Amino acid sequence: MRDRLPDLTACRKSDDGDNAVIITVEKDHFMDAFFHQVEEIRSSIARIAQHVEDVKKNHSIILSAPNPEGKIKEELEDLNKEIKKTANRIRGKLKAIEQSCDQDENGNRTSVDLRIRRTQHSVLSRKFVDVMTEYNEAQILFRERSKGRIQRQLEITGRTTTDEELEEMLESGKPSIFISDIISDSQITRQALNEIESRHKDIMKLETSIRELHEMFMDMAMFVETQGEMVNNIERNVVNSVDYVEHAKEETKKAIKYQSKARRKKWIIAAVVVAVIAVLALIIGLTVGK
């Protein structure tokens, strides 16, 4: 009967090799999918950044006109909706990545892939918080400038209000009461009345928008704060690596320079030795000749 052990061993090795290939391929596919998701998030963040710039432009147009066109305000509202929708989508994806990393960490998987995912997640979270902070600052600035326009219109009508009084009127959230109070105090022009009413409505919308962003900010900003040191360490290591490479280049240049000088000195010493030997040989020759 023929011994089948070598064949079985070969088959087992072949199976093990196939399994290793399958695991490697699955791993590669997983990281490919992850990096694809990273690029999608980066693109979404870049899209929000562009929308924020458009929002700022619309803010400037609205503030520069006493009664801006409805089209501009509609465009601004659409931009705000798109930013919030995209931001919530990004937030969901970042949460999913965070949970995936936590699961792998709890399973004692501390592979290079996990560290890469953690780093990418931290970098993306920071970029996301940065762009949303810029958006929030634009909203707050628009609110303050709109409030300033209302104050100026009130001053034109002869009514002076403090910041506290204006804030109290704005926080009431009832434009009709707000305007009726103004009318009862002074005879106001229709144009000034329309602008005050328009600015008041803008501020009411902003209040809602800023409140909606608050939860997202608290959630993402806290994560970035806890993970920030890791990102800073990575950035520090990269900078140190670059400095080390530059230092190594300088040291290499110095070594080559010193080596060149040393080689030149060797040739000079050799030439001097040869000259001395030649002189000694000449002296000895002359002495013997006598």
Curated annotation (Swiss-Prot):
Pfam families linked to this entry: SNARE, Syntaxin
Transmembrane feature ranges: 267-290
All copies of domain t-SNARE coiled-coil homology, residue ranges: 193-255
Keyword Kinase assigned: no
Ranges in coiled-coil conformation: 69-106
Membrane listed as a keyword: yes
UniProt topology in membrane: Single-pass type IV membrane protein
GO cellular component: basolateral plasma membrane; cell surface; cell-cell junction; cytoplasmic vesicle; endomembrane system; extracellular space; lamellipodium; membrane raft
Cited PROSITE patterns: SYNTAXIN, T_SNARE
GO BP, sorted A to Z: acrosome reaction; cell differentiation; cellular response to oxidative stress; cornified envelope assembly; digestive tract morphogenesis; epithelial cell differentiation; exocytosis; intracellular protein transport
Tissue spec: Heart, spleen, liver, and testis.
Location of Phosphoserine modifications: 14
GO molecular function: calcium-dependent protein binding; SNAP receptor activity; SNARE binding; structural molecule activity
Entry keyword set: Coiled coil, Membrane, Phosphoprotein, Transmembrane, Transmembrane helix
Family annotation (InterPro entries): SNARE, STX2_SNARE, Syntaxin, Syntaxin/epimorphin_CS, Syntaxin_N, T_SNARE_dom
Residues exposed to the Cytoplasmic side: 1-266
UniProt cross-references to PANTHER family, sorted A to Z: SYNTAXIN (PTHR19957), SYNTAXIN-2 (PTHR19957:SF36)
Task performed by this protein: Essential for epithelial morphogenesis. May mediate Ca(2+)-regulation of exocytosis acrosomal reaction in sperm.
Subunit structure: Interacts with SYT6 and SYT8; the interaction is Ca(2+)-dependent.
Similarity-based family: Belongs to the syntaxin family.
Annotated protein name in UniProt: Syntaxin-2
Organism: Rattus norvegicus (Rat)
Lineage: Eukaryota, Metazoa, Chordata, Craniata, Vertebrata
